[in-house]
Regions:
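Residue-level signal for the nucleotide or nucleotide-sugar donor/cofactor binding architecture
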Residues: 12-18, 46, 107, 121
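Conserved C-terminal active-site "lid" loop/helix of NAD(P)H-dependent oxidoreductases
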Residues: 17, 53, 76-117
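Conserved catalytic loops of nucleotide-sugar-dependent glycosyltransferases that act on lipid-linked
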Residues: 2-8, 12, 97-100
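Residues that recognize and position ribonucleotide moieties
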Residues: 3, 13, 44, 66, ...
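Mid/C-terminal beta-alpha module of Rossmann-like enzyme folds, strongest
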Residues: 26-91, 127-131, 137-149
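Substrate-positioning beta->alpha
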Residues: 6-28, 36
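Generic structural signal for individual residues within well-ordered alpha-helical segments
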Residues: 21, 52, 113, 124-128
Length: 149
């Protein structure tokens, strides 16, 4: 289940892994000397509301439109922190995760986008491909499984 915290106007910078791989390949093919540091981000940055729209479209599911105020989200997060402390279990919801969710996290990728690199996939296409892989496609016993937090 999903519950929107806040108005959803906070913006998030994201990158599709296929584009990151293509960018690294592009840089390796240039074979430039020296050290070059890049922040890879696919643009445009999306608001949480627009990101939910992409997810709804990709999964063909309606996400509940109920929104709770940020202060109530924090309160719930602190409640889960206390439960986690008492039970000594790590829970999926915490005050830290609420804080990250409602924050704007935007990064500057001007250097990447002025380097001549053209991403092979739009951010929306990358999100669609990722969501399909993670939540729609059938899995076999031979598929590798990666666990994250």
């Amino acid at each position: 289940k999903f519950l929107m915290i806040g108005k959803g106007q906070n913006r998030k910078s994201m990158a599709y892994v296929g584009n990151v791989v293509a960018f690294i390949k592009h840089r390796l093919e240039l074979a430039e000397e020296g050290y070059h540091v890049f922040n890879y981000i696919d643009k445009p940055d999306l608001t949480m509301t627009s990101l939910l729209g992409v997810i709804e479209k990709s999964l063909n599911k309606k996400i509940p439109s109920v929104r709770i105020p940020i202060w109530l989200g924090y309160l719930g997060g602190f409640g889960f922190d206390m439960i986690a402390f008492v039970t000594r279990k790590k829970l999926a919801i915490s005050s830290v995760r609420v804080k990250k969710f409602v924050a704007t996290t935007q990064f500057d990728a001007t250097k990447v986008h002025s380097s001549g690199f053209k991403a092979p996939h739009s951010l929306e296409e990358g999100l669609d491909r990722t969501l399909n892989y993670e939540f729609v496609q059938e899995r076999s016993e031979d598929d590798e499984v990666f666990y994250t937090e």
